[in-house]
Amino acid sequence: MMEKTDETIPSREELAVYIEEAAVSVTNNYEEAPAVLMVDDAVIGTLGNFSASIGKAKSKKTFNVSAIAASALSGRTVLRYRSMFPENKRKILYIDTEQGRHHCQQVLKRILRLAEMPDDKVPENLIMLSLRKFAPRVRLLIVEEAIGTTPDLGLVIIDGIRDFLYDINSSSESTEVISKFMQWTDDKQIHIHTVLHQNKNDEHARGHIGTELNNKAETILQVEVDKEDKAISVV
């Protein structure tokens, strides 16, 4: 399948292929996107789509996505998250764009403990990448390559999306990143769940990327510290 990017102008032959690929027929049978992530009985994620967790700084967004990853890894209910990935979609790619390897290792161990798996043994279906040291453009390319070359991939966790951009308020950069999410999820039939901070003074996700995320994501989960007990976060 030809890659659809904004970097080159497609030839007429390529455009003809894209039109054929995008055509919707009234007689074809198109299956509904399979539900793969749920909170209790509410669907929050399907294959071919992406979702997000948003919240203020220190609201335990990473812990929240750790629970999602643990449920997908174990097939069990973890903190009310349930997962139903097909057998050929059991691989998880967890990408952290902010933290170094030591912190990422702690997150990895937490996921394994939540999944009730040993935290001193390499998990078969979970790959974690720390992309802190790379430039935004390189991070995006690394993720694209990892998604394209990981067999049996079903779930990609990206903590966080902001670090794919040089300017969080750039409309062109934001559109490019969200377009990549739509392309990857559709072409590979995976689910992507990402993380973004909220503004300090309101409930909106930060920057133009937050606006695009709100407009295009299948589900937005808001994570916030409990007003009665600061040690607890609620979704």
Residue ranges and their predicted role:
Residues 1-16, 149-152, 226-235:
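C-terminal regions of RecA-like/P-loop NTPase motor modules
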Residues 37-41, 78-82, 141-145, 178-181, ...:
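A generic local structural motif
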Residues 52-53, 58, 63, 172-235:
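Phosphate-binding/switch region of NTP-binding enzymes
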Residues 71, 75-76, 111-114, 164-167, ...:
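Conserved, well-folded catalytic cores of nucleic-acid-processing
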Residues 86-169:
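Conserved inter-motif catalytic segment of the P-loop NTP-binding fold
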